[in-house]
Amino acid sequence: YEVMPSLVGSEMCIRDRIVPGNHEYYNYSDVMERGMQWKWMFRENVGFYQNQVIRIDDTDFVLSTLWSRINPNDEYFVWKGMNDFRQIKFDGKLLQVEEFNRMHETCIDFIRKSVEESTAGHIVVVTHHLPTLEVIDPQHKNSVLNSAFASEYGDWIANSRIDIWIYGHSHTNIDTEIGSTKVICNQMGYIFA
């Protein structure tokens, strides 16, 4: 990844909206400290948004982490293989698969409701996790860890009013189209302080 942290909040970026990903909660941050719907402005023009809709002109931006749904058959492998379960807290305890899946349900319910209720001419959904397995890197297509990265909503997206779905988290930039929705990868990468 090429990371240019000096751009975030600079004069080159008028307004930055950041969707928190799993790494924003590492080092034992508690996911529930802020709840499942919040915004946090850490500069006048830069902020994190979780399960929020922002209207700009005639476009609704639906912003959500969209935690993925862990496949029951892969729970053990995901729990053992992903640092999230050793680095993130949920209500004071280390995150477990059950809470991960509960957060997923909260996020997808928010996204679906926001898209359904939108009166904007255009809808852009921005998530951290992937909305479809179609954008998993081909070299990882059969990985037991895929459900920690993506949930399958291709059929719903194809029949939705969503114009663009922007995602990150995949470690590989893959763009595609599902129905009339452009699915675009825009991940920032890691910032090491």
Show which residues each predicted segment covers.
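Active-site metal-binding loops of divalent metal-dependent hydrolases
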Residues: 10, 22-24, 52-53, 65-67, ...
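Active-site-proximal loop/helix segment associated with metal-binding centers of metalloenzymes
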Residues: 62-124, 129-140
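Single conserved hydrophobic/aromatic residue that forms the stacking wall/gate
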Residues: 1-9, 14
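Metal-dependent catalytic neighborhoods of phosphoester/phosphodiester hydrolases
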Residues: 10-11, 20-43, 136-138, 174-179
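Beta-strand-turn-beta hairpins that frame and shape the catalytic cleft
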Residues: 53-63, 122, 177-182
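Short catalytic/ligand-binding loop motif for oxyanion handling, primarily in non-cytosolic enzymes
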Residues: 26-28, 56-61, 69-72, 132-135, ...
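A conserved beta-strand/loop element that lines the FAD pocket in flavoprotein oxidoreductases
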Residues: 46-49
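Conserved beta-sheet core of the metallophosphoesterase superfamily
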Residues: 17-19, 132-193
